[in-house]
A protein has these predicted regions:
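Non-catalytic pre-domain segments flanking phosphatase-related domains
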Residues: 1-7, 217-230
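N-terminal helical cap/lid subdomain that shapes the substrate entry/recognition surface
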Residues: 2-100, 122-123
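Structural recognition of alpha->loop->beta junctions
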Residues: 121-129, 191-208
Length: 230
């Protein structure tokens, strides 16, 4: 199988992180459990149930369910504001043109993933996807990354992960996959590097501009060599 580039979506390809923050702020306020936006932001990209449990300080199950439902409702109301991050579409097309698989390795629910895919408008280059239904616990646990590898039919030595969150880097590392970091989700370079992401770029466009210096280029050379030997 062709080597694969595994992409997180929220905050990595689509400018959605701060809409999630807004939705969670509203949901927590509705329950009389106000949480500062900066605290929520630092949890974005984490498994949803883990985020709720952490920020609600283990509130009763029915409260956690209402929090999740409130987030979904407020997020859906704001999806008209979603947009691809600079260079996102061009990056996906370039990766596909290099003979690599484009895999959306996200733990977003199916309904959110459908919206994100419409925003990206890149269906012709996407090989495989994952969603929240594929694992019981998502990032920072490595399960969703392993599912993405399995769907692509490759091992960790023939893949690289691209993500914007500490949780992305930790999940990728747990599955043995190198991680390229992006600042577009609002997390500091130093934090991404400490979690294992290297190198780190500003956004998809910055990564695209420096693609030849990354593992993506190495995987493309491997794919080209394998194709020539056929």
């Amino acid at each position: 199988m062709k080597p694969a580039v595994l992409f997180d979506v929220d905050g990595s390809l689509v400018d959605s992180n701060y809409l999630h923050v807004y939705a969670w702020v509203r949901a927590f306020d509705d329950e009389g459990l106000p949480v500062a936006a900066w605290q929520i932001h630092r949890c974005i990209g984490m498994d949803g149930s883990t985020l709720v449990r952490t920020l609600s300080k283990d509130a009763p199950d029915e409260v956690q369910e209402r929090l999740s439902g409130g987030h979904s409702r407020y997020y859906r109301e704001s999806t008209h504001l979603l947009a691809p991050l600079p260079g996102a579409r061009a990056l996906l097309r370039r990766v596909a043109d290099l003979g690599l698989q484009v895999v959306l390795a996200t733990s977003a629910p199916d309904d959110e993933l459908e919206i994100l895919r419409k925003v990206l408008d890149s269906e012709e280059v996407i090989s495989k996807t994952t969603s929240s239904r594929d694992v019981d616990t998502a990032k920072p646990e490595p399960g969703i990354v392993q599912v993405a590898l399995d769907r692509a039919g490759v091992d960790a030595d023939h893949a690289v992960f691209v993500g914007d969150a500490v949780w992305d880097a930790q999940a990728a590392g747990g599955a043995g996959v190198p991680c390229i970091g992006l600042l577009s989700g609002g997390i500091a370079r130093e934090e991404l590097q400490a979690a294992g992401a290297s190198p780190v770029f500003a956004d998809p466009q910055d990564l695209l501009d420096h693609l030849d210096s990354t593992r993506i280029h190495e995987l493309a050379l491997h794919a080209a060599s394998a194709e020539q030997q056929r």
